[in-house]
Curated annotation (Swiss-Prot):
Protein keywords: Oxidoreductase, Peroxisome, Purine metabolism
Involved pathway(s): Purine metabolism; urate degradation; (S)-allantoin from urate: step 1/3
Stretches the record annotates as Disordered: 1-23
Family, similarity comment: Belongs to the uricase family.
Source organism of the structure: Drosophila pseudoobscura pseudoobscura (Fruit fly)
Protein name (Swiss-Prot/TrEMBL): Uricase
Disulphide connectivity of cysteines: none
């Protein structure tokens, strides 16, 4: 947020107290233009124990509130403050009372609770990060006595795989997070979901040619190169009533992987990071009508050929097998794609 210009004293004799936007007299010629407080990094694990098959959700939650009053800042008056420790307790109590279905629905419930419970709260912002637990999976392979190794009673067979009923493995492929903002003066709830840290690499079918050729250029045309990136992506929903948040997150992830990798046997050509990014964003808007705008960043993680020319006596010929990973510096490509005539908070 840009700072507002400093206000000048009203007369030459000195400054008089200013009046803030909520009508409260402030002690100096300055005013608080943004404020809020909350509890961050509240870790919660919820276990659903419906029969022998258990389901878990582990979150890291942040809750921030904005009050109508600023008297806690100006006067040191804490009478309107909902303590951050109370906000922490609210996370656990609502998880116990209502359970957890998805990070977005839990964040919506938390935000709405703060506005319903405390009339002096103007805005609630809830941030949730999901810990990626998946069920332990055991393939249905035949043992010496021709018995499937996944025949234990603690496993449920799905698609020739045995999924454990109550054991899980941490699989940090990508982070699922969301931000929910609920304002008392705005009937529309802001729900933003994201993917963070989706690292991918392919060894062929990526090129970069015919770019600007001038006196500053040293990079040759690259007709076939390693393409690696770490995708960060976020999108905002225009409709939160009809969307399945968990399914939508998985759909976006699958779309990104499909446009990056293509068919498992054939692959797909990537003439630039920009084009791959755009195709992914476009397909998300095509497939999920509740998404109004999507933003994506793809840093270009470089892998350069190790130069074997000085070592022809040891390894004669060209090298297309050994590469040097170079994290810094790296290119960064990003774009935001939106439906026409919409406003967003991305």
């Amino acid at each position: 947020m840009f700072a507002t210009p400093l206000r000048q004293p009203t007369n030459a004799s000195g400054a008089r107290p200013a009046v803030s936007m909520d009508g409260q007299e402030t002690p100096f010629q300055y005013e608080i233009t943004d404020h809020g407080y909350g509890k961050d990094a509240v870790k919660v694990l919820h276990v659903s124990r419906k029969g022998p098959v258990h389901t878990i959700q582990e979150f890291e939650v942040g809750t921030h509130l904005k009050l109508y009053s600023k008297k806690d800042y100006y006067q040191g008056n804490n009478s309107d403050i909902v303590a951050t420790d109370s906000q922490k307790n609210t996370v656990y109590l609502l998880a116990k009372k209502y359970g957890i279905e998805s990070p977005e629905k839990f964040a919506l419930m938390l935000g709405q609770h703060f506005l319903n419970k405390y009339s002096h709260v103007e805005e609630a912002h809830v941030h949730v990060e999901t810990y990626p637990w998946q069920r332990v999976c055991q393939e249905e392979t035949k043992s010496v006595n021709n018995q499937g190794q996944g025949s234990c009673n603690n496993f449920t067979s799905i698609d020739n795989r045995s999924l454990h009923n109550h054991a899980f493995i941490f699989t940090p492929t990508a982070l699922h997070y969301c931000d929910v903002v609920i304002r008392r003066t705005d009937p529309k709830q802001t729900v933003i979901t994201g993917i963070k840290g989706l690292r991918v690499l392919k060894t062929t079918q990526s090129s970069f040619v015919n770019f600007v050729n001038d006196e500053f250029r040293s990079l040759p045309d690259q007709y076939d190169r390693i393409f690696s990136t770490v995708v960060d992506c976020s999108w905002e929903y225009s409709d939160t009533e009809t969307v399945n948040f968990s399914r939508a997150w998985q759909t976006v992830k699958n779309i990104i992987l499909r446009n990056f990798a293509g068919d498992p046997q054939v692959g797909v050509s990537s003439p630039s990071v920009q084009h791959t990014l755009y195709l992914s964003e476009k397909q998300v808007l095509d497939v999920i009508p509740q998404v109004s705008v999507i933003s994506m960043t793809m840093p270009n993680k470089h892998y350069f050929n190790f130069d074997t020319k000085p070592f022809q006596k040891i390894v004669p010929g060209d090298n297309n097998e050994v590469f040097i990973p170079v994290d810094k510096p790296h290119g960064t490509i990003y774009a935001q794609l939106a439906r026409k005539n919409i406003s967003s908070h991305l």
